Amino acid sequence: MNTINKKEIEKFSKIAAEWWNPNGKFKPLHKFNPIRIKYIKDNIIKKFNLNSSNKPLKTINILDIGCGGGLLSEPMSRLGASVVGIDASKKNIEVAKFHAKKNKLKINYICASPEILKIQKKFDVILGMEIVEHVEDINFFIKKSSELLKKNGLMFIATLNKTLKSYVFAIVGAEYILR
């Protein structure tokens, strides 16, 4: 079994160069990211009883599954976290590595999925943001992802609801309301 949906990987590989274009194909994520980052940061601080200093996540190890070009990995790194970002698209990983290096960030990007990740540690926090709608087997994805989480760790999973109403709200919300 695996979680990789080859059609989704091909689709995202074709648009990998767009990740850091705030007006490109990932514009809704760029608009929504500040809200996501604050929510994640605040919940990590609360869960692990951290000080909200300049680098509040400096003691936290994060695994960002389906990291794409690093839109969430980079802010988590800037907040002090030690970040490993994984994505099944080699092109996404190349974009993420290039952008992190350009911004002098130390993020370990690996072309992998949760079931094939060869890493000997477990993580305080796992991020699976806007990824489950792109995997082959959601239950297997959740199982394999949670095996990488430390006991009493924190896992964030988010996806768009697959209804017309939620799609319209997400697009309209990201495009107009979050300006």
Regions found by a protein language model. Name each.
Residues 26-29, 103, 109, 177-178:
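A C-terminal cap/extension of S-adenosyl-L-methionine-dependent methyltransferases
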Residues 47, 51-167:
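Conserved SAM-binding loop
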